[in-house]
Amino acid sequence: MTTATTAAARANRGSQTHGRSPEELRELVSHWGAELELAPAETIIEWAAATFGEKFCVTSSMADAVLSHLVSSVVPGIDVVFLDTGYHFAETIGTRDAVAATLPVNLLSITPVQSVAEQDAAWGKDLYKTDPDQCCALRKVAPLAEALSGYEAWATGLRRAETKNRVIAPVLGWDAKKGKVKVSPLARWSD
């Protein structure tokens, strides 16, 4: 199932109920991080689903469908958040559509407030070339922050093998900017 949403009109699961405080969430990371560090990806996902319930989602760039497939096998019906920046290749959109059609997930295709044409009119053509930071803020950072607002934790497909900056990425971490628990069940996976 695919749900297309815009930044102006989003309704996340659980956004009407009060969740844990940032201190409580950080305590969960502190308590469980080391214990889950060597756990299989499925165990990490099971823990996150049991701990956060409907306040747990997955973000996916659709570079592949591994994480969506893995999480949906453990937590059928989970929300999978995809940022449709307006700049994706057709293959990426095809993967998104295949995930929505073949996996038991609730795919949320999130779009920025402005279309690419509206952004070009407001900021000039090809903002990603002239001011990539502003472009990312408008097309990725702000929409993701809003999309995650109703959740306490989210799973990412981050892997330590991807870059040297991610070599020490924990499977369970605290994202202070987002005020959320970041779950990386694939962190220990290699190429």
Where are these regions (language model features)?
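Nucleotide-activated chemistry modules centered on ATP-dependent adenylation/adenylyltransferase
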Residues: 2-191
